[in-house]
């Protein structure tokens, strides 16, 4: 159970980081 929770937390962190980086790159390109 603990490993599953940590695995999902890791996936969520990666998805959040990639989405933030993607939005940041799009904003830089829009300027």
Swiss-Prot record:
GO terms for biological process: photosynthesis. One of its GO terms (cellular component) is chloroplast thylakoid membrane. Disulfide bonds: none annotated. It comes from the Eukaryota. It is found in: Plastid, Chloroplast thylakoid membrane. GO terms for molecular function: electron transporter, transferring electrons within cytochrome b6/f complex of photosystem II activity. Keywords: Chloroplast, Electron transport, Membrane, Photosynthesis, Plastid, Thylakoid, Transmembrane, Transmembrane helix, Transport. It is a single-pass membrane protein. InterPro entries: Cyt_b6/f_cplx_su6. The chain crosses the membrane at residues 4-24. Component of the cytochrome b6-f complex, which mediates electron transfer between photosystem II (PSII) and photosystem I (PSI), cyclic electron flow around PSI, and state transitions. PetL is important for photoautotrophic growth as well as for electron transfer efficiency and stability of the cytochrome b6-f complex. The 4 large subunits of the cytochrome b6-f complex are cytochrome b6, subunit IV (17 kDa polypeptide, PetD), cytochrome f and the Rieske protein, while the 4 small subunits are PetG, PetL, PetM and PetN. The complex functions as a dimer. Belongs to the PetL family. This is Cytochrome b6-f complex subunit 6. It comes from Angiopteris evecta (Mule's foot fern). The gene is petL.
């Amino acid at each position: 159970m603990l490993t599953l929770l940590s695995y999902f937390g890791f996936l969520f962190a990666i998805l959040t980081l990639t989405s933030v980086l993607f939005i940041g790159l799009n904003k830089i390109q829009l300027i």
